[in-house]
Amino acid sequence: MSKLPTVLEGIVEGRRGHLPEIRERISHVDVSALPASTRSLYDGLRGRGRGEAAPAFIMECKSSSPSLGMIREHYEPGAIARIYSRYASGISVLCEPDKFGGDYDHLATVASSTHLPVLCKDFIVDEVQIHAARYFGADAILLMLSVLTDEEYASLAAVAERYSLDILTEVIYEEEVARAVALGAKIIGINHRNLHDLSIDLGRSARLSALLPADAVVVSESGIRDNATVRELAGHSNAFLVGSQLTSQPDIDRAARELVYGVNKVCGLTTPTAAQAARAAGALYGGLVFEDASPRNVSRETAAEIIAHEPDLTYVAVSRRTDGYADLIQEGIGVVQVHAPYQGSTDAEIALLDAVTDNVPENVQVWRAVSMTGDHDGAALARALVESDSVDALVLDAGDGGTGTSFDWSGIPDDVKDISFLAGGLTPDNLPAALAVGCNGLDLNSGVEYPGQAGRKDARALRRAFETIRRFATPKDPS
C-alpha cells in the first residue's frame, strides 16, 4: 500500500470514525438478504472511447470538495441525476459527509431518480460501507489502492461481488497500476489529482493507461473541465468521471451538453420542433435568421414561439443589417450575429461592431460573420477583429453563408480558432475533418436539412451530426 497523502489520510481517518454510526444506521438490515444489483456500470463503459467509439461519462453529484469548498449551496441530487441521465452512462454520488457534504440519503435519492447504474463514491475501508452502499441503492463502489492493502482490497471486493456490485479501482501511481492488474480489477480509475497538494496532472492517464491490458476499462478522473480536454484524453480513456465542473454551474444541463458535445450552433431554425431536435441532439446555440430574402427567415412572432417551446438553447439573431439590432432582441436572444457585407476596411468593420455593441444590451454577445472567400483577405480581417477585441466570437463562412458551400480551412489563422465557429458546407460526413481544424465550435445549417428544402431541418441528420461530434478524439501529435 502506498503511503497515505496527508489530505487523504485525514479524510480516511474521519471515515473510520463514522463506522459505528454507519453500523447503527443499518443495524435493522439483514445484509445477507440484500438483492444483487441489476444495473452494470462495467457494461455501460466497456467498448467506449479509446478513439473507437464515443467516450462514456460518469457524472457526479457533489455539493462540496476539499479543493473548492462549497460548490453548490442548493444541492438537489435527484434533480441533478435526472439531468445526468440524458448524457451519462453512470452517476456517481458522494457519500462522505465532512469534506464532500455527502450522505447515504443522496445515494438513495439518485438511485430512485435514474435508470443508470449508480456509483457510491466513498472512502471505503470496511465492509459495512459496502452493505450500506447496496442497501441505499448503489450498483458500484469505489475502492482506492492508496487506502487499501491488497488483502483489504480482495476482502472488500469479495463482499461487493456478493451483491454484483462493479468496482471502480482508483490508482495514482505506477505501482498501484501493477497492483490493480494483479488483483484483477476490471474498471481502473486514473486520478489526475495529486492527493498531497491537490494539484492536477492531466498527463497521468496517458502514462498509466499504457501500462494496462487492452481490455481494461479506463476512467479518467479529476481536472476534466471542458470538451477540449475530453477530446485530448479520449484516445486512451473509455470514460470520464466529472463532478465539480458540472455541479458548480448554475445551468447543469447546459454544462453537461457543453462537456459532452462542445460549443456548437444549429443555424436557420424555423420551427419549434427543429429547435427541440437541435437541443436534444446536443446544440448549445440556435440561429434565428431575420432576413426577408432568406429562405430561413423568421418573423419576430415565430422567433418568440420557437424560443417559448425550446428555452434551453441560447438563441442567435442573425441579420445582414448594419443598424437596428436592438429591434431583434427579445427574451431568449443571447447573441446577435452581424452578417452585413464587408465594410471596406478594418477600421470600418470595427466601427460597425462597436455601434452594434452599443445598440444591444450589455448581456448580449456580438458575433461577426467573416467571409473567407470574398474579395478581401478574410484571414487578415479575422485576425484584426480578434486583436481589436471588438467581437465575442467570429463565424468563419464561405460567401454570404447558408449556401452549403465550404472553403479552404487550411487558411484559418491558428490565433483566431479559439474564438471562432467554423461554418459553411458542414455535413455529418465531413464533420471529423471540420473538428480536426480546431475551432472553438461548429455552425451547422444546410448540411442538416432535407435535400432541396432550405429551412427544414432533418432531425435524424442532426442526431447523426452530434453523434459524430461526440465520437471525435483530437488526433495525436506524431512528434
Where is each model-derived feature located?
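An N-cap/entry alpha-helix motif that binds or orients negatively charged groups
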Residues: S2-H74
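Catalytic cores of alpha/beta
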Residues: V125-G137, E174-L183, S220-V242, T270-A281, ...
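N-terminal active-site wall of soluble small-molecule enzyme domains
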Residues: L68-E161, L165-L168, E174-R179, S205-L208, ...
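Glycine/Thr-rich beta-alpha phosphate-binding loop at enzyme active sites
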Residues: S63-H74, I80-G101, R179-S209, F290-S294, ...
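Active-site mouth loops of central-metabolism enzymes
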Residues: I58-E76, P117-I124, L168-V171, V219-S220, ...
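C-terminal helical cap(s) of enzyme catalytic domains, especially alpha/beta-barrels
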Residues: L202-L212, A234, L246-C267, R300-E310, ...
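Glycine-enriched alpha-helix->loop->beta-strand junction motifs that scaffold or abut catalytic
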Residues: Y87-A88, S113-L116, Y135-I141, E161-L165, ...
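Glycine-rich phosphate-binding active-site loops on the catalytic face of alpha/beta enzymes
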Residues: A132-E152, G189-S199, H236-L259, A283-R296, ...
